[in-house]
Amino acid sequence: MASESDTEEFFDAPEDVHLEGGDPIGYPGKVGISALKETENSAYKVGNESTVQELKQDVSKKIIESIIEESQKVIQLEDDSLDSKGKGQSDQATASPVTAGTELSNIPGLLAIDQVLQEDSQKAESQDVSEETELESKQCFPSDDTCEKPVDETTKLTEISSTAQLNVPETVTEVLNKEEVEVKESDVLESASSHSLSTKDFAVVEEVAPAKPPRQLTPEPDIVASTKKPVPARPPPPANFPPPRPPPPSRPAPPPRKKKSELEFEALKTPDLDVPKENITSDTLLTTNMASESTVKDSQPSLDLASATSGDKIVTAQENGKAPDGQTIAGEVMGPQRPRSNSGRELTDEEILASVMIKNLDTGEEIPLSLAEEKLPTGINPLTLHIMRRTKEYVSNDAAQSDDEEKLQSQQTDTDGGRLKQKTTQLKKFLGKSVKRAKHLAEEYGERAVNKVKSVRDEVFHTDQDDPSSSDDEGMPYTRPVKFKAAHGFKGPYDFDQIKVVQDLSGEHMGAVWTMKFSHCGRLLASAGQDNVVRIWALKNAFDYFNNMRMKYNTEGRVSPSPSQESLNSSKSDTDTGVCSGTDEDPDDKNAPFRQRPFCKYKGHTADLLDLSWSKNYFLLSSSMDKTVRLWHISRRECLCCFQHIDFVTAIAFHPRDDRYFLSGSLDGKLRLWNIPDKKVALWNEVDGQTKLITAANFCQNGKYAVIGTYDGRCIFYDTEHLKYHTQIHVRSTRGRNKVGRKITGIEPLPGENKILVTSNDSRIRLYDLRDLSLSMKYKGYVNSSSQIKASFSHDFNYLVSGSEDKYVYIWSTYHDLSKFTSVRRDRNDFWEGIKAHNAVVTSAIFAPNPSLMLSLDVQSEKSEGNEKGEDAEVLETMPSGIMKTDNTEVLLSADFTGAIKVFINKRKNLS
């Protein structure tokens, strides 16, 4: 709206100048005058009789009489020549009175007097005035040639009228001159007239006629003629106009008005957003004093416990009650209301579910939502955010199909009659040359049989999944080496063919693990999923440090406010875990990097957890399908704050430079930037389009832009400062079945190269260059058709890893090794390496950000027991985690649909 008002003011300015400058000069040179215009002018003169009387009192009678005598002499000389012409002109006007005709006959004589008296002044000012006239006519008005009518007998009249008009800008510019003040008074009368002749000429005609008392304006032409003579100064009349303004210069468009929420966010944006990364290293552990006291001085650009625990503990997503364009939202702030019947009675839950119809797109059948749980495949969440939840039949079928495809590929490369393989499997078991292949097939079919039995068992005895003993079945695959495979046509050398499983963290999660995230230092692992509980796993060499931090808060009176009942339950589980974790460790398993039991468990969510995010000082955010985001801290046992949303919260991310702010994406189509200390939404925006479901969100370019992924395959970028739309990428293929965008499941930035990694449900991973939004690389080979699986980079960004629906963990090189591949497309990467260590869908797979912390743990543990806690940790953190390339070692973690978590260590061969 601001831009429109500015535009109106710009176009109004020339009109103001036009009115103030004098006559609108569409008609400066016309001689033919209509009687109607003359009548209007005379009426205007009568209305201004008081003004003329004042002028008559100020002029001496001698000057008046002398000028009248001279005018009568000139009239007698030129009366005969111009009398006929004046009458002819008056006859042409319609409805002209007789008095007007007589006055018009005297116009040339009076104007001739004006010309004689002003002849001297015209000679001195002719050059300046002509230049001003040309400039004024070019700037504000059209050309005089287009509107003038050439009349031979009125040449003098034209010159005098033009001279009278030329005096207008002269008198305006010289405001301080006493003589010019009187001319300005006449300009007032001239600006009010819209006739072809100047107003001063009309005044002369009217003042000559003595028969009409209202028109006794004879002094006016004398005053005009005597403007060059010194007259006593007098104040200007009140009707005087200000001098004309020049046309306004073109000015740039004003910046858009900022909303109140944006101004508040900018006010909160202290220079800490620009603090370099070196000032706060994410790899060094916070000291005990920093974590316990939480002083603002030590962590000014970061979130501290004092601000996190202050204010409301439950925050609603009101977005300050304003829409992106500043309009107030009334219905959304009030929240959804329960529908009512025609009589006004509130509907029950059963009635609401029965009124909503669900259509099965495969069969076309429509059923009420109340029966959807029984009719539709179980395990699918309402908005397809993740894969099957309770039964594994659909997953098993997909896995079997992928296994059959894998066997078909091996059959094509086999030279021993691959097509007869299925018919002669039992016979080949007895053949010496096929013993290895027979064992492989038996292993494949055995695993599928076990999976089928497990799926049936889980359906019939679903509650038995909560029994920790059920995880013992998962130990069967680890009695033999990890299965490795590579892409067809990828002949090696391989980087992960020697990978080994060093730890199995199964038995804790009761259901699928949907997300896993490492802390910035690499010593803590957070995992969450279907059982609504967040679990924190700590490295063995860092357990004592974090345990002391937690115990310090427990013994110092619990600085946090009174915990809720859910917090008390969480505290109880944390305390029990802390006591038992020190005694339940397996002393024989020295290669296991993590303690076998979680460091703590956070309970409070009432539905599946979908995403996690760590801050650099051990704050943790968790988002859930219960429409909330909860804030935790590693030293506290209760939830610090709960941020309520309107729909499922699919993605969250701390701001990389200022973790007082975090980003949340929800299925209501809104992207929110939350201010944790103020407990409110600082900025927000809404996705456009038919499909407004946000399924992924993250920051890129070190927090400069916020990126979200949608259900229809769009990556939309917003500038973080104002959360305004910047650009977008439609993630899809140019042709084929993937030409329609599919759900975005993950967005990961590639630091240092201005690129992002996008995972989608078309079983493709794409690397985009943000400089021109071009596709740098496309990775394929894994299966991701309906899950919330996302890919991520290794600690040195040389590799990327992803889970898969076919039970494998897939690894790609970020860029092609030209020494291995000579004739391949530079923007396609089909050369993957696969690892199979799970019997279910691999829902999450990540690299450890600091693998050196997990190597030689037996030596590090001995040093940590003999020295002070934290000294050895600080030595290990002297180098940033992103540049550790000295040892070619990777630590990989993967989680599956059953809740099992596996830890792998891979030592690559020395690079040449």
Swiss-Prot record:
Residues 261-277 have a biased composition (Basic and acidic residues). The modification Phosphoserine is found at residues 3, 50, 66, 71, 81, 96, 126, 261, 341, 343, 402, 469-471, 560, 564. Residues 2-170 are annotated as: Binding activity. Keywords: Acetylation, Cytoplasm, Endosome, Golgi apparatus, Membrane, Phosphoprotein, Repeat, WD repeat. Interacts with the GTP-bound form of RAB11A when membrane-associated. Interacts with GRAF1/ARHGAP26 or GRAF2/ARHGAP10; the interaction connects the endoplasmic reticulum (ER) with the endosomal tubule. Interacts (via FFAT-like motif) with VAPA (via MSP domain) or VAPB (via MSP domain); the interaction connects the ER with the endosomal tubule. Does not bind to other Rab and Rho small G proteins. Phosphorylated by ATK1; the phosphorylation stabilizes its interaction with RAB11A and RAB11B. Residues 560-572 have a biased composition (Low complexity). The FFAT-like motif is important for interaction with VAPA or VAPB. Residues 232-255 have a biased composition (Pro residues). Residues 334-504 are annotated as: Interaction with RAB11. Residues 210-256 are annotated as: Important for interaction with ARHGAP26 AND ARHGAP10. This is WD repeat-containing protein 44. Downstream effector for Rab11 which regulates Rab11 intracellular membrane trafficking functions such as endocytic recycling, intracellular ciliogenesis and protein export. ATK1-mediated phosphorylation of WDR44 induces binding to Rab11 which activates endocytic recycling of transferrin receptor back to the plasma membrane. When bound to Rab11, prevents the formation of the ciliogenic Rab11-Rabin8/RAB3IP-RAB11FIP3 complex, therefore inhibiting preciliary trafficking and ciliogenesis. SMART domains: WD40. A motif (FFAT-like motif) lies at residues 9-15.
